[in-house]
Amino acid sequence: AAHVDNAPYADKVVGYFLCGGSGEWNDYWDYSQPAQQGFAEWLSGKYGNNIQLLKEKWKSKDITFETIRLPSWNELCVADDGIFYTPERSQRIIDFLYYHHQVAADTVIDFAKAIKEETGNRKLVGLWNGYIFLPGWWNGSAPYNIMTNWRTKMFSKVLESPYIDFIAAPYSYQERHSGGFFVPQIPMDSIIFHGK
């Protein structure tokens, strides 16, 4: 932002559109040691450092905060019921998705805050986010549960951020053909309600 603010075209720039990964904040799963450690720390906070409660919720007698492992790609590909995970069978997956999506939301909010601070709050900041309506995407033919890879499970956090001014999303990819129709993927009323 500082570089652009000092450029001859600075007065032509009204804002910044944050893009991560493909531009839509989708990524490949992070199986690094810091990701493993971050997940364990997040779980410790969520469950109040109570390993017995975690064992009960995950239905795992042998787990400790030190031996927690991230769900494999194959585990993330298969939901319990269509695109849904149930706490009774998949609390471990649910916890991981909440953690992973929270990290993504925190990241975009941190970037947005940095831009706002760097520009003296004079520039707009937006991003792709909020894809909660994906009609036709889960029809059994997808190679994985597509809902797990949309960094929008923490959409409320993004909506409530004072550093993000607008949110955008392409219309559904499923009906992009001759004779197709426009299907929005984001909850427009919620976005408007939050002043975005």
Segments and roles (model prediction):
Residues H3-P8, Q185-F193:
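Short amphipathic alpha-helices and their capping/turn segments at secondary-structure boundaries
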Residues E175-P187:
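Extended catalytic core of nucleotide-activated donor transferases of GT-like folds
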Residues K196:
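Aromatic- and carboxylate-lined catalytic core of secreted/periplasmic carbohydrate-active enzymes
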Residues A1-I164, P170-Y173, F181:
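Polysaccharide-binding and catalytic clefts of secreted carbohydrate-active enzymes
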